[in-house]
UniProtKB/Swiss-Prot annotation:
Its EC number is 1.11.1.21. The record marks 85 as: Transition state stabilizer. Heme b binds at residue 252. GO terms for molecular function: catalase activity; heme binding; metal ion binding. This is Catalase-peroxidase. PANTHER family: CATALASE-PEROXIDASE, HYDROPEROXIDASE I, BIFUNCTIONAL CATALASE-PEROXIDASE. The lineage of its organism: Bacteria, Bacillati, Bacillota, Clostridia, Eubacteriales.
Length: 725
């Protein structure tokens, strides 16, 4: 090859996505593979964290805060405000709708987050932390370090935090599964519908922002409109009004914003910066490009007279002055005290001979003009201890919301208190059932009269609420019997309740018969019944198998279940049950991939589960769509065999989600199926997997793989088993 002929390299050029933009994105089911992870398959971050000299690390972080570096000088001689912003923006991407985002993976290091306009100059914060990360290596992840550094920053400035939990393992490549919006430009706002409703599952109001635009919606400096967006955005991030006020007022107690000059002085973001910038972005051509010449948001505001100390001064200033609109040197809308009030009360970040007036953002003024926010903010002003405690608790929630239940928490500063947002579970105070008990319970389940479909559907409904994104949901707790899950349409309440009553009867009878401390939970019994159903179905197909089962689940109470918070886990679509709550603009097969990703399934696991659940007649509403078998209730590979059989010609119907399979020779109607079903014959990659199971030698492999995938789903929230490993 002549060198002048080299125009590109491997992996470049026009992609399949360029040719076919609506193609299924199956890559999100295979991200974060061992091939991308330099730590190797045997690396166990939990075990490495336990070896960490935690207190020495905190001391190193404390020293870092006041050791200003010439290459990026600390505002007011303290890096605390910058580090807090980094930690906040790492955690603040979380949204409760799908549990994605947040601090748990350390994704701020990668695109797109590392180049968002709201994260300008946080690349400097991470570089300041690098010597400490380098020192402690594998024993502290970037994900944990960023949050712990935020805690230490707060503590070093006088706030008493309520604790810290480690356990966040780093990813090593960008997260491709998170939908951040469809806008093609930064700060785009196409995510709002005609009635002003923010698109699901998004929380941030504009592309590239963590929360809302500090100048106001679309840079309109209207505090009341800003308050409306703040309330919606923070709600979608799992925060109530009190937590919202505490976080904004507490966070803006520290530091300043940066708008020394026009953002036109900034160079490209890290992902677009020249190679010699070594991963840093936003090179600033104004003045020295740092210190007093720093440009970040374009806003130039210092809120308090002591920006490196925890005080109530933000609230005092907010209510102590009357405010008027002005513009920053960069031309951004912000607020200043009227009639020159407050001049000289605020220090300069870098020049001890300069003083300024305090400033506010439109989103700060929102706390004063919104009647609900104002009442909370004034209460905090009058009760500074309550304010400090409210911020500390909201900060812990913000930074730990996506870490999962307390059983995943690591470290010596884990709070003793249990919070409702952690989806708490009771501690087991009884002995677990043994193999003999399991065999006896299986017999009782078999004799109960429950059908294979009822047992499998109930177990699936219980376990498949799990979200790998924020580690919520799952079978542990048996919350399927509690509000709100007991009433979810997808769970077919009228059919679910009798099944639960039958299982509760078996549970009570077994527990009453015990003379010792041995008990079985309903959560375990639901999963065990699913095992019984699958074993019977395999037997119907000619296979004797044992579905793995490990007891240890407990039963949560209604008091331990936040109904509003759990309502976000309701499946409005579940392709595994061929369920759509309503018509969506997104095709059903794409929704299936989204659901499979939340269940941490691979494409083969998703495929085999669909094939198995269809032949077990586990469709919502008992529809026959995709039940491509004459032997429902037998765990056969019939779904794949018939889906790929050229005898059948598939035709669209008036319902865009339903298709008819007719005999090519006679035109006789044989099958009906949905888009979710047909995609396993239509999509080339999924068809390749389906062919494995449709082959003459594929039946046994199908059963084995189905059982493995099923067991994985049943145990997704068994973090106790992972700890034992």
């Amino acid at each position: 090859m002549r060198e002048e002929d080299i125009r590109s390299t491997a992996g470049h050029g026009t992609s399949n996505k360029d040719w076919w933009p609506n193609q299924l994105n199956l890559r999100i089911l295979h991200q974060h593979s061992e091939k991308a992870n330099p730590m190797g398959p045997d690396f166990n971050y939990r075990e490495e964290f336990k070896k960490l000299d935690y207190w020495a690390l905190k001391e190193d972080l404390r020293k870092l805060m006041t050791e200003s570096q010439d290459w990026w000088p600390a505002d007011f001689g303290h890096y605390g405000p910058l580090i807090i912003r980094m930690a906040w923006h790492s955690a603040g991407t979380y949204r409760i709708q799908d549990g994605r985002g947040g601090a748990e993976s350390g994704a701020q290091r990668f695109a797109p987050l590392n180049s968002w306009p709201d994260n300008i100059n946080l690349d400097k914060a991470r570089r300041l932390l690098w010597p400490i990360k380098q020192k402690y290596g594998r024993r502290i992840s970037w994900a944990d370090l960023m949050i712990l550094a935020g805690n230490v920053a707060l503590e070093s400035m006088g706030l008493k935090t309520i604790g810290f939990a480690g356990g966040r393992a780093d990813v090593w490549e960008p997260e491709e599964d998170i939908y951040w919006g469809s806008e093609q430009q930064w700060l785009g706002r196409d995510r709002f519908g005609e009635e002003g409703k923010l698109e699901d599952p998004l929380a941030a109001s504009e592309m590239g922002l963590i929360y809302v635009n500090p100048e106001g919606p679309g840079r309109e400096p209207d505090p009341l409109k800003a308050a409306q967006q703040i309330r919606e955005t923070f709600k979608r991030m799992g925060m109530n009004d009190e937590e919202t006020v505490a976080l904004i007022a507490g966070g803006h107690t520290f530091g300043k914003t940066h708008g020394a000059a026009s953002p036109s002085h900034l160079g490209p973001e890290p992902e677009a910066a020249p190679i010699e910038e070594m991963g840093l972005g936003w090179k600033n051509s104004y003045g020295t490009g740092k210190g007093g010449d720093t440009i970040t948001s374009g806003l130039e505001v210092t809120w308090t007279s002591s920006p490196t100390k925890w005080t109530s001064n933000f609230l005092w200033n907010l209510f102590g002055y009357e405010w008027e609109l002005t513009k920053s040197p960069a031309g951004a809308w912000q607020w200043r005290p009227k009639n020159g009030a407050g001049e000289g009360t605020v220090p300069d970040a870098h020049d001890p001979n300069k003083r300024h007036a305090p400033g506010m953002l439109t989103t700060d003024i929102a706390l004063r003009v919104d009647p609900v926010y104002e009442k909370i903010a004034r209460r905090f002003l009058e009760n500074p201890d309550e304010f400090a405690k409210a911020f500390a608790r909201a900060w812990f929630k913000l930074t730990h919301r996506d870490l999962g239940p307390r059983s995943r928490y690591l470290g010596p500063e884990v709070p003793e208190e249990e919070f409702i947002w952690q989806d708490p579970l009771p501690k087991r105070d009884y002995d677990l059932i043994d193999e003999g008990d399991i065999a006896e319970l299986k017999k009782r389940i078999q004799a109960s009269g429950m059908s294979i479909r009822e047992m499998v559907m109930t177990a699936w409904a219980s376990a498949s609420t799990f979200r790998g994104s924020d580690k919520r949901g799952g079978a542990n707790g048996a919350r399927i019997r509690l509000a709100p899950q007991i009433g979810w349409e997808v769970n077919e309440p009228e059919q679910l309740r009798p099944v639960l009553e039958t299982l509760e009867g078996i549970q009570q009878e077994f527990n009453r018969s015990q003379t010792g401390r041995k008990r079985v939970s309903l959560a375990d019994l639901i999963v065990l019944a699913g095992c019984v159903g699958i074993e019977q179905a395999a037997r119907n197909a000619g296979f004797e198998i044992t579905v793995p089962f490990t007891p240890g689940r407990v039963d949560a109470t209604q008091e331990q279940t936040d109904v509003e918070s759990f309502s976000y886990l309701e499946p409005v679509h579940d392709g595994f049950r061929n369920y759509l709550k309503r018509k969506f603009s997104v095709p059903a097969e794409h929704l299936l991939i989204d659901r499979a990703n939340l269940l941490t399934l691979t494409a083969p696991e998703m495929t085999v589960l669909i094939g198995g659940l269809r032949v077990l007649d586990c469709n919502w509403g008992r529809t026959k769509h995709g039940v491509l078998t004459d032997r429902p209730g037998a765990l056969t590979n019939d779904f794949f065999v018939n889906l790929l059989d050229m005898r059948w010609k598939w035709n669209a119907t008036d319902d865009e989600n339903v298709f008819e399979g007719r005999d090519r020779a006679t035109g006789e109607l044989k099958w009906t199926a949905t888009r979710v079903d047909l995609i396993f014959g239509s999509n080339a990659q999924l068809r390749a997997i389906a062919e494995v199971y449709a082959s003459n030698d594929g039946q046994e492999k199908f059963v084995q793989d189905f059982v493995k995938a099923w067991t994985k789903v049943m145990n997704l929230d068994r973090f106790d088993l992972l700890v034992k490993k």
